[in-house]
Amino acid sequence: MPDISRRRVLGLMGLAPAAGGLVSAGVSGATRSDKPDAKSDSAPSAPDLLAASRAAREKIRLKYLPNVTLYNQDKKRVLFYDDLVKNKVVTLNFFYAKCEGVCPAVTANMVKVQKLLGNRVGRDLFMYSFTLKPEEDGPAELKEYQEMHGIGPGWSLLTGKAADIELLRKSLGFTYPDPRIDKDKSQHIGNIRYGNEPLMLWSACPGMAHAQWIAESISWVIRS
């Protein structure tokens, strides 16, 4: 499968705070006053800004980052938000072990990204792939997939209850508007979502974009 053009990937990689509007609304509400002597041009205080940021982050967590129970390729039990995402920079995508469509190509491309990022993976960045077929992919199958594709440390493959995986997929936006296509797992979305959770910076890119461009975009999120 050919790499996606640089022009297209740059258009899809535009970064923005996932809840910028929430932060603005929170700050506005915290600093507005109807009293005649209130200074309309006064800047919001540091405590107000911090409170607004925390409120926005919590709204994002509740709506998009469900704290479901998962198991990685080493049979370790983890919670999605508390253990995998909170206070971290992450990449997120979906696959399944016996996929004959986009999965092998995306995995191979992300292995290139992992190598480009070097020892930052597992330290400054954590990579997560979630199976779309938890009824088939247990920890043993995920471990085999990891070894087969040369996936290195800092990249976890995860499974769990089917209902939890589906909740996670929908919450993270890996869906098609057409329900007939959306339920066909062989046509699943091959995108990568990446973000800086504490800073509320989230974006996405095609999984087959040029590995160097993906690595550069992720590095920008790490530095933010």
Model-derived features: positions:
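N-terminal secretory signal peptides and thylakoid transit peptides that target proteins
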Residues: 1-17
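N-proximal helix/coil linker or "cap" segments that precede and/or mark the start of modular domains
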Residues: 31-67
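A short beta-strand-turn-helix
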Residues: 69-89
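Short active-site neighborhood of thiol/selenol oxidoreductases, capturing the structured segment around
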Residues: 82-102, 110
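Conserved helix-turn-beta segment immediately C-terminal to the redox Cys motif
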Residues: 107-128
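Thiol-based oxidoreductase modules, predominantly thioredoxin-like and allied folds used
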Residues: 124-136, 154-163
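Short, internal strand/loop/helix patches
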Residues: 144-189
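Thiol-/selenol-based redox modules, centered on thioredoxin-like
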Residues: 182-224
